[in-house]
């Protein structure tokens, strides 16, 4: 990814750094409008997800997470920006005339050929079952349930590793550090998701953040006691507690947030590292 650094001509462009190469040119048959009316609210209008609101209108791109065009070669025609995710997407022309979007694998360029199936080469961008991959393969867009499409390792720069195969299961190390079991019949895409340098971008001003639909984040220590457990006091007062708390009074910073007694507890060999 090419990072474009702004010249300091105005305060808004000072220290700004954005991607200057990838553009957006969505295809009409692969997009549809989405009604984003919630802005972090539930059906009663109460905020359930803070710091969301505003933002530019978006068209949703239909991404092919299943990769079910088996044994049909496709060519990368364009690499495009997707406002609904931080990874780029590729526009693919298949040999049978089908046209689809997929996640952009790192290093893929326009003109590359990809294919999905059971007996395809271990090449960046190809999709195949885990049982046909050698150990140590870097993968992304991993299925959890057979035929449901990729659900793991889909963010920009995400990559998992196939570390073992035994019986009907394969052992994967996920980007979070979690080690878990997945059926060997599930499919995944070879390689790493592109746009690795997404964290190097600097928006430069608050208005650019608002375009993304992200509202300002206010510290609890500067609020009133009615708004946050850390609020109140005279001047720059500490939080007044032994341990930090969430706005609803629950323990923060270290408390486990995973739901208990989930079906997948037996599939997780090592919990994620923080």
Swiss-Prot record:
Residues 1-21, 225-274 are annotated as: Disordered. One of its GO terms (molecular function) is transferase activity. One of its GO terms (biological process) is mitochondrial translation. PROSITE patterns: RIBOSOMAL_L2. It is found in: Plastid, Chloroplast. Its main location: plastid. Keywords: Chloroplast, Plastid, Ribonucleoprotein, Ribosomal protein. SUPFAM superfamilies: Nucleic acid-binding proteins, Translation proteins SH3-like domain. InterPro entries: NA-bd_OB-fold, Rib_uL2_dom2, Ribosomal_uL2, Ribosomal_uL2_bac/org-type, Ribosomal_uL2_C, Ribosomal_uL2_CS, Ribosomal_uL2_dom3, Ribosomal_uL2_RNA-bd_dom. Pfam families: Ribosomal_L2, Ribosomal_L2_C. SMART domains: Ribosomal_L2 (SM01383), Ribosomal_L2_C (SM01382). GO terms for cellular component: chloroplast; mitochondrial large ribosomal subunit. Belongs to the universal ribosomal protein uL2 family. HAMAP family: Ribosomal_uL2_B. Part of the 50S ribosomal subunit. This is Large ribosomal subunit protein uL2cz/uL2cy. It comes from Gossypium barbadense (Sea Island cotton). The lineage of its organism: Eukaryota, Viridiplantae, Streptophyta, Embryophyta, Tracheophyta. The gene is rpl2-A.
